[in-house]
Amino acid sequence: MSLHVTLRFTVALAAGLLFGFGLALSEMINPIRVLSFLNVASGHWNPSLLFVLGSALAVAFPGMALQRRLKRPLLDECFHLPSKKVIDRRIVFGSAIFGTGWGLTGLCPGPAIASLSTGLGPVLLFVAAMAAGMIIHDRIVVRCLS
């Protein structure tokens, strides 16, 4: 394995470990914590997860500024940036479905996968159903649009 490939795997491993640890430490893997953050209207809103958002922005903004100055990333051939900038029906509908699921369960993909470490049955079922939903999307929606 080349040094370049080893570095890419090492960076991916370190980023994944940091992300998973941060999800657990911030309690993003706790659906009750997430639902209390999303529960703005009840008078029992818990804004603590705003620190997660703030930390992401504190890293992303300088990273985006650096990206604009670089010709290519250090460990890849090019930057993989979204090219679609139009908000269409698919984005709106998909966002509504995602938001409904997140609001009902308090879990979204990253925290759900990190929650697998708990070994809890409902989390295992949620992740399996989430994967099934993605497979159904790929088999039906992507094929219809192709």
Swiss-Prot record:
Pfam family, one: DUF6691
Inducing stimuli: Repressed by BigR.
Transmembrane segments: 9-29, 46-66, 91-111, 116-136
Membrane topology value: Multi-pass membrane protein
GO CC terms in record: plasma membrane
Subcellular location: Cell inner membrane
Keyword vocabulary terms for this entry: Cell inner membrane, Cell membrane, Membrane, Transmembrane, Transmembrane helix, Transport
InterPro entries (alphabetical): DUF6691
Superkingdom of this protein's organism: Bacteria
Miscellaneous comment text of the record: Part of an operon that comprises bigR, blh, XF_0764 and XF_0766.
Family statement: Belongs to the TsuA/YedE (TC 9.B.102) family.
Name listed for the protein in its UniProt record: Probable transporter XF_0765
Protein source organism: Xylella fastidiosa (strain 9a5c)
